A protein has these predicted regions:
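Nucleotide-activated donor-binding/catalytic signature segment of Leloir-type glycosyltransferases, i.e.
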Residues: 242-263
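A charged, aromatic-enriched C-terminal amphipathic alpha-helix characteristic of glycosyltransferases
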Residues: 333-374, 408
């Protein structure tokens, strides 16, 4: 799912890119990324072996998540043998899992739903919850149909299950629970500071929208400023429609086209304040933690999971929030030495994610798809075809098998690919062919 016109600045793209770059180093993966051809994109540090497939997507996020172009996916499934769809649009999980025309469930493409967000009752009822009821239903059924659901936080998982219990029967909820896993994630490592502002500086890198409760945050800032305290607030992620409301004497509004420039600005600040009532992770807070900034946040949603245990600067009320901020400024507390911040790094996340994928395919390692072919004459033909070649074009091999009297129901691309692997052929992204090791 893409949120902004500049793909390179999209938070979902950044997470996927960083994970791809890490996982490729293991030598175990080939990645294809589906991106919107109608949005802006420039070549960045995405690993050169990652193959980009361009396709048209709706502009609106709400339209993207209910959009499933069967013609495009049919062509993708015809051309490539895919083991796993790392699905960032969880509403489509059941379609992607069962779209393939095959009779055998264990030969379908596996689907790993990657939950970035949840439609939950903690969102504004009239603007973001009630109008998205159809998306909520799709999220739940998409989660039910996937092989595995990955959640960055326990709170994110809890929200989905809470909604599912209102819609599904208990045994169906149990199916989602049994195919779900929670592991804290992250997409960067420690952020070092070359320079810090001399004036006590808060970064506000959250949206000025709805559930972020940004008005509450700036009401507290106003109280501090009117009490004579000296500080400034850098806004980096403001929604244009509300920027006029925060055009205050202590505020500086900055925008960045490059993510690296934004990170550099963040590294100059001391504290991150948020009043959000709905989160599934909160990348902006994780970034500040990895720069050892002080976090002042509600003692709820995902924040207790992101900070250390017994972290001292989570609040229960606006009055408590004011006292915490006042204490930070008066005592010039400009950093916090987190003991558990490694749990939020891309290094840790990539290790966890690698294990999750490996475990998902563990059973396949002990199964031979070639040996399960019933007709000996077919096995002989396939074996001869593969033993006389060092390079295989997947489409040619598929056509060869189909000429033996088979079709996609009994020989889907995923099965054909596994047979190639059993005969020590590996996929080479640059040539789009399989070569013998």
């Amino acid at each position: 799912m893409l949120s902004v016109d500049n793909i390179n600045a999209d938070s979902n793209y950044i997470i996927v890119k960083q994970l791809c770059n890490k996982l490729i180093k293991t030598g175990k993966y080939n990645f294809f990324i589906l991106l919107d051809k109608n949005r802006k994109y420039y070549k960045d540090d995405l690993h050169k072996s990652v193959k980009i497939i361009w396709l048209p997507l709706p502009r609106s996020k709400k339209h993207q998540v209910i959009h499933f172009n069967t013609n495009i996916f049919r062509e993708i499934y015809k051309k490539y043998a895919i083991d796993l769809v790392w699905n960032n649009v969880v509403e489509r999980g059941h379609h992607i899992r069962y779209f393939q025309d095959t009779l055998l469930d264990n030969q379908r493409v596996k689907v790993l739903n990657y939950h970035h967000y949840v439609i939950h009752r903690s969102l504004e009822y009239l603007s973001n919850y009630l109008p998205c009821t159809h998306i909520l239903y799709d999220q739940i059924i998409g989660s039910l149909g996937a092989d595995l659901n990955y959640f960055h936080t326990q709170h994110c998982y809890n929200m989905l299950i809470e909604e599912a219990k209102d819609i599904l029967l208990p045994d169906q909820v149990k199916k989602i629970e049994d195919k779900s896993i929670v592991k804290l994630g992250g997409y960067i490592n420690k952020i070092k500071s070359k320079y810090k502002y001399e004036t006590y500086t808060f970064i506000y890198n959250h949206r000025l929208d709805g559930y972020k409760n940004w008005k509450d945050t700036f009401e507290v800032f106003d109280l501090l400023y009117n009490a004579g305290y000296k500080f400034k607030v850098i806004i980096t992620a403001g929604d244009k429609g509300n920027l006029g409301s925060v055009n205050k004497e202590y505020v500086e509004i900055k925008s960045f086209s490059l993510h690296s420039d934004y990170i550099n600005e963040l590294s100059k600040c001391h504290c991150n304040v948020i009043n959000s009532r709905h989160e599934t992770y909160c990348i902006s807070i994780a970034e500040s933690i990895l720069n050892d900034q002080v976090i002042v946040a509600p003692n709820k949603v995902t924040f207790p999971e992101l900070v250390d245990q017994d972290y001292p600067h989570l609040f229960e009320s606006k009055e408590e929030q004011y006292k915490i901020l006042e204490n930070l400024i008066v005592n010039n507390i400009r950093e916090y030495n987190y003991k558990e911040s490694n749990k939020l790094t891309i290094d840790q996340h990539s290790k966890n994610f690698d294990k999750i994928i490996t475990d998902l395919f563990e059973k396949d390692l002990y199964e031979s798809y070639f040996d399960r072919i019933k007709k000996e004459s077919t096995k002989k033909e396939i074996k001869n075809y593969l033993q006389t070649r060092n390079e295989i074009d997947l489409t040619d091999f598929k056509n060869f098998i189909f000429k033996l009297g088979y079709a996609s129901q009994s020989f889907p691309m995923s099965k054909i690919k596994k047979i190639l692997n059993e005969f020590n052929f590996e996929y080479i992204t640059f040539t789009n062919k399989y070569q013998k090791k």
